[in-house]
Amino acid sequence: MAKEKTVYVCSNCGQESPKWVGKCPSCGEWNTYVEEIVRKETTNRRPVSGIETQKAKPVILSEIEADDEPRINMHDDELNRVLGGGLVPGSLVLIGGEPGIGKSTLVMQTILRMPDKKILYVSGEESARQLKLRADRLSEVSSDCLIVCETSLEQIYVHIKNTSPDLVIIDSIQTISTENIESSPGSIAQVRECSASILRFAKETHTPVLLIGHINKEGSIAGPKVLEHIVDTVLQFEGDQHYMYRILRSIKNRFGSTAELGIYEMRQDGLRQVSNPSELLLSQDHEGMSGVAIASAIEGVRPFLIETQALVSSAVYGNPQRSATGFDIRRMNMLLAVLEKRVGFKLAQKDVFLNIAGGLKVNDPAIDLAVISAILSSNMDAAVEPEVCMAGEIGLS
């Protein structure tokens, strides 16, 4: 017989409380506590997976064989780079991103390139027919890719037991629910319980699992922060839907570096790997145009060239406007203050607009020199030589 109890869980960080509170004491957010009903079993229950596994036994550390196990080749150079050289067997990987950014497309075209692996694709958002249409659009078909549309965690384990796949894809974790939790799919308790169960399955059976997750309005993975702590690797798929490029960034990686990133170009037939991102980010028609400067920046450990565009004009509507796209507006205001105080350029009564071409968001301070060069170029209406590439941080002194 199961006992029920009511708890309140913060939808932002996963902090639990026996009663509702207005402000979360853990993350400081307001009105984020939601009611959850949790059943506590009075008897020992069987594992949700129902898959027979060996019980763990203590072993001597020096007797453990630590041979490097070969990683699974994903047949995608950018994805392999971000994962740290490939997918580690028995690992749990979470891929997050905005709706429609291309997460399912990235995973689908990757698994279709793996004919040597038996893959089970579990979809909780699309039907089998919709997945077939997506695969046809990608022009790649694998005979060893199995599709199942299911949202029950218990039934997913049944399909895994019957098929014995080499790799499991779950799209998405917010649609999966377990019978042990009396709450709707996507709730804090469901996401946490399902993720913890899937992690135990991956470790016990040595089967890698890829989870696809959504992000909330703050840009973090939807669900409790404990979800990011549960999984082995967290990959963020970023980009603007109005631009054709996408960036795959590693936020957490227990088996590799978090400094790597992969760049893709969105096309009608799927995502194309971009080995030289400078070709994608630089335009070819800016020669002789004022307000344009080329900068050398580093994202992760990959250096590439970006185009910095600026427009300076007289303020017409009273207070001058300051706008920056892809660059920190506060840092731009600091650079404008340095120009006025240290160099003597009077920009207090000018509108200043800054844009990083391609929609890229850059935090590298090495592009400061290119930013002020583009601003001065636009203010003086004098073009910067197209062969000049700039890199340098600007200080207050």
Ranges and model annotations:
Residues 2-12, 16-81, 88-94, 101-111, ...:
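Peripheral, non-AAA+ core regions of ATP-driven protein-machinery
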Residues 119-123:
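Conserved RecA-like ASCE P-loop NTPase motor core of nucleic-acid helicases/translocases
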Residues 98, 124:
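P-loop (Walker A) phosphate-binding loop of NTP-binding proteins
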Residues 125-127, 215:
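Residues in the short beta-alpha loop(s) of Rossmann-like NAD(P)-binding domains
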Residues 148:
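Conserved SAM-binding strand-loop segment of SAM-dependent methyltransferases
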Residues 126, 151-152:
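Short beta->alpha linker loops
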